[in-house]
Amino acid sequence: FVVNVIEDIVRRYDVDAIHMDDYFYPYPVGNTPFPDEYAYRKSGSHLSKDDWRRSNVDSIIKDINIAIKKTKPYVKFGISPFSVWRNLKDDTQGSDSKAGITNFDNLYADILLWLRKGWIDYVTPQLYREINDPLIAYEKLVDWWSAHSFGRHVYIGHGIYRAYEKNVNWKDPNQLPNQIKIVRK
């Protein structure tokens, strides 16, 4: 269904790109498991449930890319994922971060696979953190995503809305200008 809708949009409208924000499994809610046990068992998959979930997401990303490129090869396809693919402690390719949730492990989105396979033309990681954040440092993630783009475009997503928060780092009027300087280096 989703692939057909996107193909229809690309065919009928003069769009430059299809941009998907947060396309993967829902963010975890406490200890409540995602209710897909029946679908997993019915699938008969020999994959672990985590790998099966990633495979489901991978399949639709690949199919969307194929539909877009078949219809109008010049239309771009991009994703705006959560800021952390995986933590370094869990994977040697991961970022130097201490995120409680990651794309790969909790949202079942293997962004690096999509970039490497060319299924997406660009990535817009949601780097809604502050510079020197002790858990997920903005500047480290800018460098990490740039180094793991596989030749695809990287457009950093800024958390401008955070300027209104009470967090002391976001009260600094130079936080966003300094982030922009980091991205431009």
Q: Which residues make up each language-model segment?
A:
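Hydrophobic, Leu/Ile/Phe/Ala-enriched alpha-helical segments that form helix-helix packing faces
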Residues: 64-68, 145, 149, 183
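Substrate-binding cleft of secreted/luminal carbohydrate-active enzymes
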Residues: 108-134, 148-185
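Active-site clefts of carbohydrate-active enzymes
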Residues: 74-99, 141-179
